[in-house]
Amino acid sequence: MDPRERVPPGNSDEETIGEAFDWLERTITELNRVAVNHLPRELIFQVWQRCWAYWREEQGMSSSYTKYRYLLLMQKAMFVHYTKGCRCLQEGHGPGGWRSGPPPPPPPGLA
């Protein structure tokens, strides 16, 4: 066996992959918790639906890849929001964005 192909002790391929999927789930959950205080829930839900429709249904990618693409888009949205001068906590638009009424359901399995 080539030493470059050896897996370090305590890190089998399955554990490494499982850890990556766990990290992805934790990161998306935390991002959603923060995002609902800064972005409208409708926007978050629409981004999730669009990612799922395009990456999962149209392109046939895995659900993990779809979640990864959702994570990238939401990180960009939060970055733009912060760079434009976030005043959410000062103005207090509250959780769920600016629209009144009951919020739509959160992205499936993510919040």
From Swiss-Prot:
Q: Origin, by domain of life?
A: Viruses
Q: Which GO cellular component terms are attached? A: host cell nucleus; virion component
Locate the motif Nuclear localization signal. Answer: 64-71
Q: What's one Pfam family here?
A: VPR
InterPro entries named among the record's database cross-references:
Lentiviral_Vpx_assoc_factor (IPR053711), RetroV_VpR/X (IPR000012)
Q: What species does this protein belong to?
A: Human immunodeficiency virus type 2 subtype B (isolate UC1) (HIV-2)
GO BP terms, alphabetized: symbiont-mediated suppression of host innate immune response; viral life cycle
User: What keywords is this UniProt entry annotated with?
Assistant: AIDS, Host nucleus, Host-virus interaction, Inhibition of host innate immune response by virus, Viral immunoevasion, Virion
Instruction: Spell out the residue ranges making up region: Binds to human NUP153.
Output: 60-79
Q: What is this protein called?
A: Protein Vpx
Oligomeric form and interacting partners:
Interacts with the P6 region of unprocessed GAG. Interacts with host VPRBP/DCAF1, leading to change substrate specificity of the CUL4A-DDB1 E3 ligase complex. Interacts with host NUP153.
Q: Which family does it belong to?
A: Belongs to the lentivirus VPX protein family.
Outline what the protein does: Plays a role in nuclear translocation of the viral pre-integration complex (PIC), thus is required for the virus to infect non-dividing cells. Targets specific host proteins for degradation by the 26S proteasome. Acts by associating with the cellular CUL4A-DDB1 E3 ligase complex through direct interaction with host VPRPB/DCAF-1. This change in the E3 ligase substrate specificity results in the degradation of host SAMHD1. In turn, SAMHD1 depletion allows viral replication in host myeloid cells by preventing SAMHD1-mediated hydrolysis of intracellular dNTPs necessary for reverse transcription.
Compartment(s): Virion; Host nucleus
